[in-house]
Amino acid sequence: MESIKNRTSIRKYAEKEVSEELLNRLLEEAERTPTMGNLQLYSVVVTRSEEGKKALAPAHFNQPMVTEAPVVLTICADYRRTTLWAENRKGTPGYDNILSFMNAATDALLFTQTFTNLAEEAGLGTCFLGTTVYMPKMIIDTLKLPKLVMPVATLTIGWPAEHPALSDRLPLRSIIHHEHFEDYTPEKIDDFYAEKEALEENKEFVRINNVET
């Protein structure tokens, strides 16, 4: 997929709506993503209203794309639905430990990535907001998330109004281990991060923050 090879975060969007039909098609296609035990331990809250986006913005450090994007998706680890299903069938769900959350978070993040790939292949731009897990309580309150539902990812979505350069990536040799894990030596670290440290924006970051590296 060329959209994956050329993938970059889009933070500026054209003043053009993302149709309900297109969004629902992409969400439905993303449901085909792998899921633990076929339980689909995730839910998605779709925010389109200006009021809703403005309410979410403080939880994302008021980054402009939250209010400027036509659509904001909050993807949640959700084992409430499965728990209630089990309880309503007189079963014991057993979703009361850290493994439960890890399973649900994994499902949610797999769904997020699949949706991102599909959306970008359809010509949309997206931005993954890592701020979701910084202040989850604010998001929980804003979206009225009940017990056993936890926000783990946020995507802003719209038609791109910018085409930024690709972000740098570490060389393949830095992430692949053959047969067993090979621990990192100082020499390997120097090798892996040499290109990143040579980038002008990273040199500027070092200068501004008055640090050695």
What is the predicted role of each segment?
Residues 1-213:
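Acidic, surface-exposed loops and disordered segments
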